[in-house]
Amino acid sequence: MRALYAAAMLTLCSLLLPGPAAAQTVELKLGHVGSPGSLFDLSATEFAKRVKEKTGGKVVIQVYGASQLGDDTELLQKVKLGTVDLALPSTVMSSVVPAFGLFEMPYLVKDREHMKRIDKEIVWPTLVPIAEKAGYRVLATWENGFRQITNNLRPIKGPDDLKGIKLRVPKGKWRVKMFQSYGASPSAMGLSEVFVALQTGVMDGEENPLTQIYTSKFQEVQKYLSLTDHVYTPAYVVASPRKFDGLPEAVRKQIQQAAQETQPFVYETGAKMDEDLLGKLERGGMKVNQADKQAFQKASKPVYDNFSTEVPNGKQMIEKAIALGSGK
């Protein structure tokens, strides 16, 4: 505890004292799992640029992508321990804060405008305080995106086509339950392991936003791309209280402002990538088909029912999120 207090005071003094000490910079490590050129990569780079500008160079964000600092689960553990300062988790948040499983509900989020309303009315007043109690400082909501299914066996037109398919999913229990209810054989796996699993046939397929599919080069080892849009996954800028809380209040505010002001860039870039990458994946040899979304929605009822009963206030959160989709 004394060592932690001393480190915090040293950081504080380096930012506030005049002279040479003031010239020192604070470096914060941000880890994420996205490949170069992914939405995660572009978003984190934009955020780092904004932090440097806002703090006049006093704070520098060092970005480590492609799981260099660990997979999603490891990054959250390291953030809590203070060995990584910032992370960009998505689905995995539901494994440490069950209420974040709200965003594992199929077809809950209609579009980015709907997500903005959910962010304002549910994420900040309800989910963020729970995350804080669990030891995570949520600075902003960004995006992973609308998820699609790829595989090597057949086009996925409806839930029945998933029966028996070995499908990689991220580490979140509701995604596993969802695909089990569709008849697939899902296995949770870190993103950095997926390419080899697909290449060797350990997994038949996976599901991800187009940005992750393309930049992870899954088109090189997958034949079919089925446009299901089954889940929209946000991403969260999460800070370690051990480091973040030791910074001066003004600096903390600047960092959080930079994170939140990056959100429009994230949404605009994500939308553009969705448009651009579909054609690139098709030209790369993938066979693309539209899925029967109504059939998937009908098959998703058990997941909603389970979340409503297992997670405190789960039913109320679902109802509120759905109502926000109609502009209420």
Per-region residue spans from a language model:
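N-terminal secretory/targeting leader peptides
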Residues: 24-114, 120-328
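Cleavable N-terminal signal peptides
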Residues: 10-11, 21
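Absolute protein N-terminus
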Residues: 1, 23-24
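Sec/Tat signal peptide C-region and signal peptidase I cleavage site
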Residues: 17-23
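Bacterial N-terminal signal peptides that target proteins for export
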Residues: 1-9
